[in-house]
Structure formats: C-alpha cells, structure tokens
Amino acid sequence: MRPALSDYRHLASGKVRELYRIDDEHLLFVATDRISAYDHILSSEIPDKGRILTAMSVFFFDLIDAPNHLAGPPDDPRIPEEVLGRALVVRQLEMLPVECVARGYLTGSGLIDYRKTGTLCGLTLPPGLTEASKFAEPLYTPASKAELGLHDENIDFAATVDLVGEKRAAQLRERTLQIYTQGADHALTKGIIIADTKFEFGVDQSGELVLADEVFTPDSSRYWYADAYREGQVQPSYDKQFVRNWLTGPESGWDRAADQPPPPLPAEIVDATRSRYIEAYERISGLSFAEWIGASA
C-alpha cells in the first residue's frame, strides 16, 4: 500500500516544487502545476505541468553521463498515489549556493548585460553580437541563488570561488558545460535548440558532486525551434518565455515596474503553454506523454 502524502513531513516550498522528508537519507521532490515568471508565482496554473517537468527530468537524468540525485524510479512505492507522476524520491544532499548556467546563445539577461558592458559574468565577448547570436563555444555564466521572490544575480567565476572554493568552482564549471553539451547535442538531433539552461548541484556524504533539482525542462531552459532559428530576432519557443512574452505585451495590461502581481493567464495562454511543454517532451524523448504515469489533469 502506498503511503499518503500526509505521512511525510513537509520541509519547504519553492516557486514550483514542494519538498517532503521520507527518512534520514531520502526526500520526496514534488513538482506542482504552478508557473513563475519575473520572480512572481502566477495565480494561474498549467494543467499537467508538474508531470511534464518530472517526465522530462527523468528522461535527461537517464541520458546524461553524470551522477544525479534520483533514489528510485518514477513509480517508486514510496511515492503517494496523489502525486504519482509528478514526484521523485531523491537523495538528501548538501546543496551548493550557485545556479550553474550554461549558454550556447546570447539572449535574455545575458544580452542585457552584454549591451551594457560588452561582458557576461566577467567574460569579455566579441563586438557585434545581437539577439540569439551563437557563441563559438558554450559559456559558463553562474548566478547567485536568491531567496524566494528575489532575483538571481549573475556573478563571475571569482565570486563562485568565494562561495564554494576554487576546486569545487572549477568542477561546477566543467560539469555544467559537459552536461549542457551532451543535452544540447541530443536536442539538436530532434530539431530543438537548447539556447541556455541552468542546473543545481549538491554534494553527497562522500563529497561527490551530484546533479539535482530539475534538468533540461522547459522551466529551466530555453527551447527554440531549430528550423525557425534566425539570428537577430526573438525566437519562437517551447518554453515559458511564451508566458513571459504575454505578460510583458500590451494584452496583459501588466506594468512590470509597478509593485503589483501579474494578472491571471487567459485560458488560451494556459492551453498553449501546456501544449508547448508536451510537444517539447515528446520531441526530445520520442515518447508519448499520454503514456507517462499518474493521473492527467
């Protein structure tokens, strides 16, 4: 008989995830249908989003050649029925205070920093780059982890050394670029460009660096259509940039600079976001989301 969610002690809430304790060594990592943008948790939810994120992470954890935090399969008997398909049993780790970002293309906050200073996280970039320019080699551009509701700040490698030490900082850079390259190469064979992504790492009791949290999901990555890619313009995408674009567009009526929460998402934006996330999973994995475990919304 599967345990009930109430059998486990709730430890923490994030923008999208809930964390519960199973025992001294294992946690229950639950992905909800919440969606966040611009450091706000939106009032609207995306049906099945938590299941899609979990399915995508499981696919990439299996694909990537790096130790990860999984401690059981997606149908592990320790997972309660009510969160089956959106929860994973994971190892407890000492999480490192760095958002490990890999960028293959210039966009988002990276483009903003480049236009101001010609640099990105302490790296001097060549002149003449524009929206969606591809880098000669992927860049490691770390960020500090902010508290819930605050904004992660891009930092340089020296600041990472201050946070975790020189040896661990070098290991984070190497592992981040290795994982990004492997995942992005796979995605490209499926017609998808992963423009950038972020990883989180922890350390286990033996001191081994372990990939944790989520990996290559549409929440943590920018997914572009490879056949529609054009340098110099904003790219159509599978990820939550679609939601960000609506929020900052005239249709939403939201003033991002004002101290007001974002408005609810219209039904068509919710439905289109769900469809994009499912399409990303199915194209990347070659699997049908309809066959993923757990109850559909």
UniProtKB/Swiss-Prot annotation:
It comes from the Bacteria. It is an enzyme of class 6 (ligase). GO terms for cellular component: cytoplasm. Pfam families: SAICAR_synt. The keyword ATP-binding applies. It catalyses: 5-amino-1-(5-phospho-D-ribosyl)imidazole-4-carboxylate + L-aspartate + ATP = (2S)-2-[5-amino-1-(5-phospho-beta-D-ribosyl)imidazole-4-carboxamido]succinate + ADP + phosphate + 2 H(+). One of its GO terms (molecular function) is ATP binding. The keyword Ligase applies. InterPro entries: SAICAR_synt/ADE2_N (IPR028923), SAICAR_synth (IPR001636), SAICAR_synthetase_CS (IPR018236). Pathway: Purine metabolism; IMP biosynthesis via de novo pathway; 5-amino-1-(5-phospho-D-ribosyl)imidazole-4-carboxamide from 5-amino-1-(5-phospho-D-ribosyl)imidazole-4-carboxylate: step 1/2. GO terms for biological process: 'de novo' IMP biosynthetic process. Its EC number is 6.3.2.6. Keywords: ATP-binding, Ligase, Nucleotide-binding, Purine biosynthesis. Belongs to the SAICAR synthetase family. NCBIfam families: PRK13961.1, purC. This is Phosphoribosylaminoimidazole-succinocarboxamide synthase. It comes from Mycobacterium sp. (strain JLS). The lineage of its organism: Bacteria, Bacillati, Actinomycetota, Actinomycetes, Mycobacteriales.
